[in-house]
């Protein structure tokens, strides 16, 4: 890896299409300009706070160089810093490893930090599994063996993933024998670094008892997550069921699960014994990743090769679709942020009401003038207003800009401003839903992908979140109220239907967006 500090990302890579977006990051496909024309994934972590230090453009992280330990950082800043720190440790102590995503290079510029990563084009773990008609214990053991191999290397390097779930396990390519890679280290932790902030994130299905009770999280916590993944692979549903999310938390804390469903009757006793050990409430009783790699079932010696009941795949398909609809529930929470910004914007701009044509022109001018394409500086925002001959708003530009510069980095996300202006004109419940949907339908495909939604909550300041939504697992409870059959494609109609299923739920999430 070159140590030339003057290199730019564009010197070495051609950036092609967008693969996914998050609350503060974007992942794009890149092609190296070398003779090999290697395809990579370029994850850009947007600069949200002080300029990053400790990683120079185009250089491999230097052992001992360190990263700034900011005493007071936002959630996004903590995640950004944390992911870079963990990826640096992976480069130093893990890579190359067949089951851990590989970091090729690091660049830094005014737009943020660019991680040039190995491209995994084979899809997510569960997406690959549900694509089959049936599979065997032996196939499941192969999956667990690869996850354990990656975790063994990470744990030896004192890295705890902390967010291990099917979405973070991707296949290298679409080949049937493709290797499985562990990725997404935004919530991971390493020794000598303060714990990342995790209170706002996702499902509790894979969260260990010690993490739920805010006790010390260790490598054993990752092993609990492996146990949950294995249980789902062999049964098609998660191990902890309950009528309410609070009950689910209690069952996790007490380790209450069973093998009573009829689909478990054909599963080998060795597999069930392994799950029971992995889902031990006491962390010290769980096998390590190294233990798993020596386990007869994981090795394949006693894993059945007979195809499992087709009902297992059917259940897994429904669980996978349900998981993706959870992303739609998270998207609806974004409405709270839109409502807050819209109210302030309305007060600021008074009676100025953009027409539909003006809104379309606003979008076009943003795309033409903003060099970044997504984030704009104050100067670019003023250029947009001038181009639209909206001179009366130019004196207000700094105040409007400041309203949306949530991270105080001197740039704003143009999608938020567009959504805010749109909400001045269209603030009814259904329109709010559509705005929420369109805002993160980045490719305008009419379908929100999992990648577009996965980091939705990361974009929300805590003060914009409703009520107790930040409590561990609360989003699962919201989702459970919206539960419906799905084919896994989150179209607007599906999104709207999920919200309209429960009028009380819609009142909670959308009332603030209705006309006052």
Curated annotation (Swiss-Prot):
UniProt: ATP binding residues: 19-27, 43
Any one GO biological process: nodulation
Modification(s) after translation: Autophosphorylation.
Induction field: Not induced by mycorrhization. Induced by hydrogen peroxide, abscisic acid (ABA) and dehydration.
Membrane-topology annotation of the record: Peripheral membrane protein
Class of the enzyme per the UniProt entry, highest EC level: transferase
Chief site of localization: nucleus
Keyword terms, alphabetized: ATP-binding, Calcium, Calmodulin-binding, Cell membrane, Coiled coil, Cytoplasm, Kinase, Membrane, Metal-binding, Nodulation, Nucleotide-binding, Nucleus, Phosphoprotein, Repeat, Serine/threonine-protein kinase, Transferase
Binding site for Ca(2+) 3: 483, 485, 487, 489, 494
GO molecular function: ATP binding; calcium ion binding; calcium-dependent protein serine/threonine kinase activity; calcium/calmodulin-dependent protein kinase activity; calmodulin binding; protein serine kinase activity
Location of this chain's protein in the cell: Nucleus; Cytoplasm; Cell membrane
Family: Belongs to the protein kinase superfamily. CAMK Ser/Thr protein kinase family. CaMK subfamily.
Additional free-text comment from the UniProt record: Can restore mycorrhizal and rhizobial symbiosis and induces spontaneous nodulation in a Ljccamk mutant of Lotus japonicus. Can restore nodulation and mycorrhizal symbiosis to a Medicago truncatula dmi3 mutant.
Protein name according to UniProt: Calcium and calcium/calmodulin-dependent serine/threonine-protein kinase
High-level lineage: Eukaryota, Viridiplantae, Streptophyta, Embryophyta, Tracheophyta
């Amino acid at each position: 890896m070159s140590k030339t500090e003057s290199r730019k990302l564009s010197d070495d890579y051609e950036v092609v299409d967008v693969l996914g977006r998050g609350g503060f990051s974007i992942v794009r496909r890149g092609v190296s300009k070398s003779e090999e024309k290697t395809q990579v994934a370029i994850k850009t972590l947007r600069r949200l706070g002080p300029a990053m230090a400790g990683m120079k453009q185009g250089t491999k992280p230097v052992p001992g160089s360190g990263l700034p330990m900011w005493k007071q950082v936002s959630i996004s800043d903590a995640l950004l810093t944390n992911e870079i720190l963990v990826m640096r440790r992976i480069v130093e102590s893990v890579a190359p490893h067949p089951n851990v995503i590989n970091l090729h290079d690091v660049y830094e510029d005014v737009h943020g930090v660019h991680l040039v990563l190995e491209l995994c084009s084979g899809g997510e773990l569960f997406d690959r599994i549900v694509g089959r008609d049936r599979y065997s214990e032996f196939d499941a053991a192969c999956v667990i063996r690869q996850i354990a191999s990656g975790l063994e290397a990470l744990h030896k390097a004192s890295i705890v993933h902390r967010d291990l779930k099917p979405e973070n396990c991707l296949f290298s390519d679409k080949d049937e024998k493709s290797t499985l890679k562990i990725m997404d280290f935004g919530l991971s932790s390493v020794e000598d670094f303060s714990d990342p902030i995790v209170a706002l994130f996702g499902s509790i299905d894979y969260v260990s008892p010690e993490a739920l009770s805010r006790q010390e999280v260790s490598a054993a916590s990752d092993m609990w997550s492996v146990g949950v993944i294995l249980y789902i692979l062999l049964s098609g549903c998660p191990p902890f069921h309950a009528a309410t999310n609070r009950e689910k938390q209690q069952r996790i804390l007490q380790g209450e699960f069973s093998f009573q469903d009829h689909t478990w009757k054909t599963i080998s006793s060795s597999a069930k014994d392994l799950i029971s050990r992995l889902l031990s409430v006491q962390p010290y009783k769980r096998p390590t990743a190294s233990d798993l790699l020596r386990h007869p079932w994981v090795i394949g010696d006693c894993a059945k090769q007979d195809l499992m009941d087709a009902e297992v795949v059917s259940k897994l398909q429904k669980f996978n679709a349900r998981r993706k609809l959870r992303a739609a529930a998270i998207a609806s929470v974004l409405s709270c942020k839109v409502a807050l910004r819209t109210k302030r914007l309305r007060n600021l701009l008074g009676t100025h009401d953009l027409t539909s044509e003006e809104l379309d022109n606003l979008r076009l001018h943003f795309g033409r003038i903003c060099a970044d394409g997504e984030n704009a500086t104050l100067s670019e925002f003023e250029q947009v207003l001038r181009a639209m001959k909206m001179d009366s708003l130019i004196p207000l530009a700094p105040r409007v800009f400041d309203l949306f510069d949530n991270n105080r980095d001197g740039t704003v996300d143009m999608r938020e401003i567009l959504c805010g202006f749109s909400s001045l004109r269209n603030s009814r419940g259904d329109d709010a839903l559509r705005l929420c949907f369109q805002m993160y339908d980045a490719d305008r495909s009419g379908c929100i992908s999992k990648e577009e939604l996965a980091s939705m909550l990361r974009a929300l300041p805590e003060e914009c979140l409703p009520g107790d939504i930040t409590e561990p697992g609360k989003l699962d409870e919201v989702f459970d109220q919206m539960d419906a059959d799905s084919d896994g494609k989150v179209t607007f109609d599906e999104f709207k239907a999920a919200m309209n299923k429960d009028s009380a739920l819609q009142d909670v999430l959308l009332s603030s967006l209705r006309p006052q």
